[in-house]
Amino acid sequence: MGAGALGVVAMVAAAVVVAMAGANSEGDALSALRRSLRDPGGVLQSWDPTLVNPCTWFHVTCDRDNRVTRLDLGNLNLSGHLVPELGKLDHLQYLELYKNNIQGTIPSELGNLKNLISLDLYKNNISGTIPPTLGKLTSLVFLRLNGNRLTGPIPRELAGISSLKVVDVSSNDLCGTIPTSGPFEHIPLSNFEKNPRLEGPELQGLAVYDTNC
C-alpha cells in the first residue's frame, strides 16, 4: 500500500475515532438524563449505555455523522429533573420535554446548545428562574416554558436573540416587566398572561424593569 493510500486510511480512521468520541460523550450525557428521570412506562428502556452511540435509542434522532440533533420526550409521563450534562449535546436542535412532571430548575448549561432551534419544556413542574444564559442560544426560534412554576424576571438577554419567533411563558409566577425590544415586539401579550406579578410596559406606560421582583 502506497503512502497516499495509507494517508487516506489514517484520515478515515481518525474521522471514525472523532465521531465515536462525540457519540460516546453524547451517550454519556443522555445516560445522565435517564438516571435523573423516573420512567414508569419504560419508554427509555432502549437507552443502553453500553452501546457505542445513542442513535439507535428510541426518541433520539441523529444526523448523518451520528450526532444527536433531536430529543422527543414529550408527553411520556416522565418525572425527575433536568441535568447540566444536556449542555454537552452541542449539535442538538430540538429539545422536547413538554407535558411531563419534570421538577427542579432549568440548567444554565442549556445556554451552550448553540444549534438549538426549539426548547419545549411547557406543562411540567419546573421551578426557579429562567437562566440568562439562554440568551446565548442564537439559533433559537421556539421557547415554550408555559405551565410551570418559574419565578423571577424574564431575562433581558432573550431580547438579543434575533431568530426568536415564539415565546410563551404564561401560567408561571414571573415578575418584573415584559421586554418590548427585539423579538418581543411581536410576541402577543397572551403568551405572558397568568403571571400575577408580571407587568407590561404596554399596559403601564414607561414601567421600570423588574419593578416588583
UniProtKB/Swiss-Prot annotation:
Keywords: Cell membrane, Endosome, Leucine-rich repeat, Membrane, Plant defense, Repeat, Signal. PANTHER family: SOMATIC EMBRYOGENESIS RECEPTOR KINASE 1. Its main location: membrane. LRR repeats lie at residues 90-113, 115-137, 138-161, 163-186. This is Leucine-rich repeat protein 1. It is found in: Early endosome membrane; Late endosome membrane; Cell membrane. Pfam families: LRR_14, LRRNT_2. Induction: Up-regulated by wounding and upon pathogen infection. InterPro entries: LRR_dom_sf, LRR_N_plant-typ, LRR_R13L4/SHOC2-like. It comes from Oryza sativa subsp. japonica. Residues 1-21 form the signal peptide. One of its GO terms (cellular component) is early endosome membrane. The keyword Signal applies. Interacts with HIR1. It is a peripheral membrane protein. One of its GO terms (biological process) is defense response. The lineage of its organism: Eukaryota, Viridiplantae, Streptophyta, Embryophyta, Tracheophyta.
